[in-house]
Amino acid sequence: PVTRVRYERERPGELIHVDVKKVPRIPEGGGHRALGRGCGSRRGAGTSCLHVAVDDNSRVAYAEQLPDERKGTTCAFMERALAFYEGLGVTVERVMTDNGPAYRSGEFNALLEARGIGHKYTRPFSPWQNGKVERMNRTLAREWQYARAWEGEDARAEALASFIERYNWDRPHSACGGLPPMSRIVGVNNVLAHN
């Protein structure tokens, strides 16, 4: 049996957990949650990829639903995630990922190296090592992805940004003593004001 060690980094940006999760697409007009399973013989709509980044200390999250998990897409997501954290006044020091091909690519590692950011990999088949982003994936599934019967993929994708904003600014988080994740950044080094 593996002993899992719980930890929390001392300051925002010290470690950002990053992961990709495949998400089934919803056909226009709604899927089986909206129409019921016996709605006809519709073909599957395929999948998209939910790219997620979570700060270890504050639990502030950034996520985008993108068409794939190729290295170009993953690098572009990482650029935007880093810009998001930098916009909050957070200096990212290190990123933790699994061993997926996009994260192992030279382009992804060059992007981090050019910014002076370290890259730590989890051990193969050890998702608990990246547990904070894995837990965020579960929260996204419960509170956004399957929270209601969506009428189509566009409606669900549009709701992601507002869910992430609500998660960061308003939703109580047990790791933050019942306060929202942004409470660990605001007043410390945040350069933005929430409306």
Predicted regions and their residues:
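Basic, flexible linker segments flanking DNA-binding modules
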Residues: 1-28, 101, 109-110, 123-127, ...
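C-terminal domain-tail junction helix/linker
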Residues: 1-6, 13-14, 115-117, 138-195
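Mobile-element integrase/transposase regions
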Residues: 1-54, 60, 76, 195
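Residues immediately flanking
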Residues: 20, 56, 68, 99
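Active-site beta-loop-alpha junctions of metal-dependent nucleic acid enzymes
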Residues: 40-49, 64-89
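Acidic/histidine-rich, metal-coordinating catalytic segments
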Residues: 69, 88-105, 125, 177-182
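RNase H-like polynucleotidyl transferase catalytic core
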Residues: 94-99, 113-132, 148-151
